Amino acid sequence: MSSLRLLADDLTGALDTSAELVGKFGPLEVCWSIASIAPAQPSFSIDSGTRERAADDAFAIVQKLAPRLAGATTAYKKIDSLLRGHWAAELDACWQTGLWDVCILAPAFAYQGRRTLDGQQYARGADGRWSAVGKNLVEQLHDRKLDARRARPADGLRPGINVFDGEADNDLDWAVKAGENYSGRVLWCGSGGLASALARGADVWVSDKLKSPVLGVFGSDNRATALQLDACGDVVIPSGDVAGDIDRIKQALDKGVAFVRLEAPDAHSRDDVARHFAREISRLSRLIDPPGSLVVAGGETVKAQMIAVEARALRPLGRLEPGIPKSVIEGGNWSGVEVVSKSGAFGATNVWAKLLKQNGLL
C-alpha cells in the first residue's frame, strides 16, 4: 500500500499540500508535535514550525525530523512557492541524512501564479507582472555546497538535487513521470503544485458549505489578508482585546458569522505580536462555544488556535480550491469542528467574501 510522509515549515503549508494528496494516499493527519505521531503510522504530515526561526535553528530542527520521512513510498519536503522561510537550509538538512538517492525540486505552482524558468522562481503580482523571487535555485543550493543541477527531459534524473522548471501543470507532470520511473529512493520537494501533479486525476474537491456559526480568526499581517478582510465588510471585528470585545463577537456569532481580525498595537517585534495573538486566541477559545466552522489564515495563527483548544491533529478532507483546504479537528475541546484555512499571502481579494456569500452570510 502506498504511503506519504510530508514535512512542511508551517501549518497552512502542511494542510494545503496534504489536501492535494488525500485522494491518492487516503486519510492522513497533519500534526505539529512529533509526539502525536504513532511510530507505526504509515502516512502523516508534520509542521516543523520553522518558517519564522533563524536558519541555523531551522536546519537543526529539520535534521531531527527528516528521518521520520523514511519508510514511506513518497517522502515529501514541502517548501513555500514564494520561497519564504529557509527552504535551502531545510532541504540541506534532509539531504544530509543520506536517506535518498535523488531529489526532485519543483516549486512552481501555476494556479497561484508561481513559475520556475531556468532555475529562477517567479511570482505574478496583482497587476499581472512577473517578478523574480530570490536568487536562482541552483545557485542557492550551490551556496550550501549541495550537488544540484537543472533537470532536462532528455537527461533523466541524476544523483543529487534535480531542479525542474515549470510554467504550466504539464511541466510538473513530466517531473512526476521522471520520479516514478526512477528505481532509487526519491525525495520530492515542492509546493502544492508538485503535490497536485503527484495526485493528478484524484478527486480532492470538497463542498464549500460552512456549518453555522462561522468563526474567523486572522492574525496574518500580509497585505493580501488585509484586502481580503476589507472585502468582507461588517462581519469583520478588529480586536486587540478579545475579552473587551467578547459581547460584540458573541452577538455576531449568534447572527451566523464573526471574523475576528487580531491586532497588537503595543507590540514592538514579530515575537511580541505572536505572543499577543496566542494569548488572545486562547482567551477567545475559552470565552465562546465551539463554532460550527472555523476560517483562518496564516500558519502561526492556525497553530495557535489548535494549541488553544488542545487539538491533537488536523485531518484534511480535501480542498475548496488549490491552496484552500478543508480539515477536521482531531481531539481536544473543539474536536469535530471543520476548518477552512489558507496561507496569509494567498488568494484573490474576494476569496472570503465569495465564500460567505455562497453560504448566505454576506
Annotate each PLM feature.
Residues S18-G26, I34-A35:
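Residues that scaffold, gate, or flank divalent-cation-dependent active/transport sites
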Residues K77-K135, P290-P291, V296-G299, K303-T349:
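Active-site histidine-anchored catalytic micro-motif
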Residues A14-D16, H86-W87, A197, T225, ...:
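Short glycine/serine/threonine-rich phosphate/pyrophosphate-binding segments
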